[in-house]
């Protein structure tokens, strides 16, 4: 029971991390400043800022106590005022196509993960037990055949 619950939480965490990573990577690729990448909600368990990030990025990475969700917080004028020199990095000032790509990148990342896992399972294969037949019982119809 506990092992099943642990496996569920790990699998869900993987799905959430891949989904949010899709949003994050596309936002960075489109030139949007990502303020926070969070897996989980609630109390912060782990927080770090990598020393090496792309110019203009100062992303804080967080793992929260409740692993049932995540988010990528981007620079956005709807949340707080944005300095004029940073407006080009705000999510809401991006062209519609860029915003659509960023929004779609999460589900696409999950789809790619599903295809890769499906291919991996089929490549490795699934071991099935062999059928073992004992000799027919003496005097049975199968024995007489």
Q: What label would you give each PLM region?
A:
Residues 22-26, 102, 109, 113:
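Hydrophobic side chains within alpha-helical segments
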Residues 4-8, 94-103, 110:
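Residue-level signature of transmembrane alpha-helical entry/exit and packing/kink sites
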Residues 1-5, 121-124:
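C-terminal recognition in membrane/secretory proteostasis and scaffolding
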Residues 19, 63, 106, 142-145:
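Terminal peptide-recognition signature
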Residues 3-86:
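Small-residue-rich helix-interface/hinge motifs
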Residues 78-97, 109-145:
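PDZ peptide-recognition modules
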């Amino acid at each position: 029971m506990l092992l099943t619950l642990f496996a569920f939480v790990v699998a869900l965490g993987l799905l959430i991390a891949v989904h949010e990573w899709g949003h994050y990577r596309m936002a960075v690729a489109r030139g949007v400043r990502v303020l926070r990448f969070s897996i989980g909600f609630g109390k912060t368990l782990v927080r770090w800022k990598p020393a090496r990030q792309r110019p203009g990025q100062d992303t804080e990475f967080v793992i929260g106590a409740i692993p049932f969700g995540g988010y990528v917080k981007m620079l956005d004028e709807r949340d707080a005022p944005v300095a004029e020199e940073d407006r080009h990095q705000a999510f809401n000032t991006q062209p519609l196509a860029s915003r659509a790509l960023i929004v779609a990148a999460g589900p696409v990342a999950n789809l790619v993960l599903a295809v890769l896992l499906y291919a991996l399972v089929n490549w490795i294969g699934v071991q099935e037990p062999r059928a073992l037949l004992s000799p027919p019982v003496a005097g049975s119809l199968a024995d007489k055949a």
